[in-house]
């Protein structure tokens, strides 16, 4: 049977959690889990050849926290690990931002960890979540009605976050601490069942363990199956995308399930929260429409039109107008207007580039609105695409949409115009 240290090394290698020359910032509270994690990483540091740093936080919730911060600092010093300390007033932050104490503490803690990681060029942050934490998270999210791919909440590796203790039960970790004389502090609030996670830990999980004494292992088997399914689905989400100024432009996949899952994942990945089921159900019900938009919260959501979509802050009508000297490149949102070679050559004129306006028409009298509908130009693109007009205000060119050939020049000394959409994405 493997020792905890041997199993620790095995899981690091199996999930590729640590690589040579990594710079790892370890989040340490002083509790048994994080104290053991710091000590384990110090023991395998020479084996994997990486650098360790430590960060600890005084949340300003308990009187004992100042002493606990000192404890962590001294432990880090004994292991020759540099330690960073931060104090927060979590109760005040929670009140000001209408958050629970748990959520406020988590937000501030991760903000600090990311700041320190950036400061010291740490490419990974290690947290001490264990198998019991995973089981508690699954039950908590199940109680809230979370979907299948959000239920596990944590993986051995999420971006730059690694969780080397995720496969170990708390009792294993406590036993290792005792056998190896690793000091740790006990946070008394961990026993206060007014906090949701503690209520699940001390009241709910014991009931499940009466049904199955190996409940945590059963949860792990379930979660590992979800991880595999999650990877399979992720491989299927090969949706063509282009990102610009915090928005994600994409071609709408034909499969409804792939579209909804793509939107759910991208929203979570970029904005830190996923749309609730009611919003995603509304999305599915509107798919028969040519154009529509669904708000997920405030002015953030998804807009779909003629087989294309944009995810993020809704695109407002851009208001711009400029007369061109036809020499320098100009940016209009995601569009770049280039003058010079390899473009469409127009007759020399005093041209203006601006946004679409109600009533715009061509020299032949056709309204732009009709052209947009005929060419199936997405509604959100209409608000931002550059419109080329002559000195009389007639539209003669809309890239990829309309071209009045009467304005083309047969001479090489005309005006050469080429319009590109950043990212190589075209509707």
Swiss-Prot record:
Function comment: Ligates lysine onto the cytidine present at position 34 of the AUA codon-specific tRNA(Ile) that contains the anticodon CAU, in an ATP-dependent manner. Cytidine is converted to lysidine, thus changing the amino acid specificity of the tRNA from methionine to isoleucine.
Binding-site residues for ATP, renumbered to this chain: 29-34
Species of provenance: Thermosipho africanus (strain TCF52B)
Protein name per UniProt: tRNA(Ile)-lysidine synthase
Keyword ATP-binding appears in the UniProt entry: yes
Domains (record comment): The N-terminal region contains the highly conserved SGGXDS motif, predicted to be a P-loop motif involved in ATP binding.
GO biological process assignments: tRNA modification
InterPro entries for this protein: Lysidine-tRNA-synth_C, Rossmann-like_a/b/a_fold, TilS/TtcA_N, tRNA_Ile_lys_synt, tRNA_Ile_lys_synt_N
